[in-house]
């Protein structure tokens, strides 16, 4: 995307007025590999009681020359994998090299994927966890034990004060993590804010951080940056697409005390890429 050879189409993401569900489409086209398609799906908060994951999606791939459908691929597992890969890439390029403590906010289906991907990027020594329903933290604790890492349930204040890297992987329409809770030098991977009104991070914290994203257009309209943009505490010009860091066009983190924030909105091209492989 950073080279201009691939682009995402505008996201559609709306409440359907039934089952408290969010439903929409993410799509795009890569001119280099001729990858064309879309992901259809959303978030059904009542699915857990039915033994289903709250996130449900299906990816459709089309032939770029004819428009014919080439494949229909289940998107639940692929979405969890690519979302974890995206935050993991942000940790690789933006977190301090000496990061030792990882803080996890959220303990749903995708949190286990996030944790397993994150530990591949830094030599973490401890995992801290916070979730609205503390009973669900047993999932993260089991993953941490499997990885040979100690796990501790903490308050948000404790998590922010200790964690060198924080991953936020939960659904919220009100800020959970505040600017006063995060120490200098922290890298925050804020994943899954992809709807107007969604918010996990206080706007003051977004404005305070050096912000990176997968796509600026999505970050300022449906992503975590929408609130700081709306209240005037930051402008879109302060946001850098992480592709520029990966390609070497941007230096990324510039100091040990800098707070970096990756606003991972999830782009259609990522879904098409993993579904095509």
Predicted segments, located by residue:
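Glycine-rich Rossmann-fold phosphate-binding loop(s) that bind the pyrophosphate
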Residues: 107-108
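NAD(P)-binding Rossmann-fold cofactor-contacting core
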Residues: 120-147
């Amino acid at each position: 995307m950073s080279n201009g050879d691939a682009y995402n189409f505008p996201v559609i993401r709306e409440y359907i007025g039934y089952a408290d569900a969010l439903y929409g489409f993410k799509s795009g086209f890569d001119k280099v590999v001729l990858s064309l398609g879309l992901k259809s799906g959303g978030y059904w908060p009542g699915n857990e009681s039915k033994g289903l994951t709250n996130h449900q999606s299906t990816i459709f791939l089309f032939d770029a020359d004819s428009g014919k459908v080439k494949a229909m691929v289940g998107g639940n597992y692929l979405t969890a994998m690519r979302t974890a890969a995206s935050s993991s890439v942000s940790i690789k390029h933006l977190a301090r090299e000496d990061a030792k403590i990882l803080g996890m906010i959220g303990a749903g289906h995708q949190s286990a994927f996030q944790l397993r991907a994150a530990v591949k990027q830094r030599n973490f020594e401890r995992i801290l966890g916070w979730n609205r329903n503390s009973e669900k933290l047993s999932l993260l604790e089991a993953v941490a034990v499997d990885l040979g890492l100690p796990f501790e349930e903490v308050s948000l204040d404790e998590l922010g004060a200790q964690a060198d890297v924080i991953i936020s992987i939960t659904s919220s329409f009100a800020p959970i993590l505040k600017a006063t809770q995060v120490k200098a030098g922290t890298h925050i991977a804020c994943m899954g804010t992809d709807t107007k009104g969604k918010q996990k991070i206080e706007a003051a914290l977004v404005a305070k951080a050096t912000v990176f994203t997968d796509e600026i257009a999505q970050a300022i309209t449906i992503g975590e940056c929408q609130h700081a943009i709306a209240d005037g505490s930051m402008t879109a010009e302060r946001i850098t697409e992480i592709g520029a860091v990966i390609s070497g066009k941007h230096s990324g983190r510039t100091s040990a005390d800098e707070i970096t924030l990756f606003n991972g909105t999830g782009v259609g091209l990522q879904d098409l890429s993993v579904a095509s492989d």
